[in-house]
Design a protein with these regions (language model features):
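Intrinsically disordered, low-complexity regulatory regions
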Residues: 1-107
């Protein structure tokens, strides 16, 4: 793939990831303004940090991506591109959770 084609594709992927983040995020914030509400709430119930909960969600997608890379087959109805977009979004969410935690520690 040529560099310009890669960045064109990358921009398209990032726009879709942002759209997915907004759409899916509404369901999980439970009408709260805290973007990480879902991870914190589950963490409290399971005695885990929000980062750990987010990592578990990420690893679920990574297992699916790993399976695709090793076998070349998609076993779910969601295409591999969707799994990659979800994994990238969970990495972004994890980064946000860590950023928020570090900011609170320095205040």
């Amino acid at each position: 793939m040529k560099v310009k084609d890669f960045f064109k594709w990358s921009d398209k992927m990032q726009k879709e990831e942002n759209r997915l983040m907004k759409v899916k995020g509404e369901e999980y914030t439970v009408s709260d303004q805290d973007k990480f509400k879902n991870f914190k709430s589950i963490g409290e119930r399971m005695n885990l940090d929000a980062e750990q909960v987010c990592l578990i969600y990420l690893l679920k997608h990574m297992d699916s991506i790993r399976n695709y890379v090793l076998t070349g087959s998609e076993v779910s109805e969601e295409p591999i591109t969707g799994r990659i977009q979800d994994a990238r979004n969970y990495l972004l969410l994890l980064g946000g959770i860590i950023y928020e935690k570090q900011r609170k520690e320095t205040e």
